Amino acid sequence: MQILVLLLSYLFGSIPIGLLIARLYNIDITKVGSGNIGATNIQRNLGWGPALVVLAFDIFKGGIVLYLAKMLGMSDFYLAACALAAVLGHNYSIFLKFKGGKGVATSIGTLLVMNPLIGLGTVVIAVGIMYLTRFVSAGSMMGGIAAVLLLLYHGDPLWQVVTATGLALLILWTHRDNFQRLQAGTERRLGSPKEAKK
């Protein structure tokens, strides 16, 4: 039973909603802008409306997977595994030859269900950094780190800390190119008219 739920978590996380939404506009989102299927690239190429749909669904993917796992009474180990499986599915989708997004929105979904207060705090910190710096990547990476620190400070259960740590590491890994561009001063800011590879 647990293995089946784990597999379904990965498969649901693998649904490339950004690709599907872009196809409604006759656009292959993997071939425009950064090539990423996430909300940021959708916003830059299709506008805020489609981007918000993609953002909402990607958050939903992470949240519903963990919610159902909790409702099924799964152990802490499998709760953490299902949350991470959903994000891994988004990042390495079986429907996209194991390519995908960067997992930020899906991670937010899992955090909001796992610990709503910490999840909201993480969103506030991430959005705040994005607003101040206009770097989506900086807000994403710092948000991932902040989630771990907030859980540790709040003294929350170990499985939540382990899950958040795994999510943060995945976010840092998928943003490694962004980090290098931040260091080099070539990262694109939110709202910048000039396209840059993301």
Model regions and ranges:
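Cytosolic, membrane-interface loops and tails of multi-pass inner-membrane proteins
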Residues: 19-49, 178-198
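Interfacial segments of multi-pass membrane proteins
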Residues: 43-48, 69-72, 89, 104-133, ...
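Short, non-helical or kinked segments that cap or interrupt transmembrane helices
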Residues: 28-38, 95-108, 135-143
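C-terminal ends of transmembrane helices
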Residues: 18, 23, 89-99, 126-133, ...
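Helix-coil boundary and interhelical linker segments in multi-pass alpha-helical membrane proteins
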Residues: 1-7, 60-81, 112-118, 151-163
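Alpha-helical transmembrane segments of multi-pass membrane proteins
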Residues: 9-14, 57, 86-90, 126-130, ...
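N-terminal signal-anchor transmembrane alpha helix
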Residues: 1-24
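Loop-to-transmembrane alpha-helix initiation sites
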Residues: 136-143, 156-167
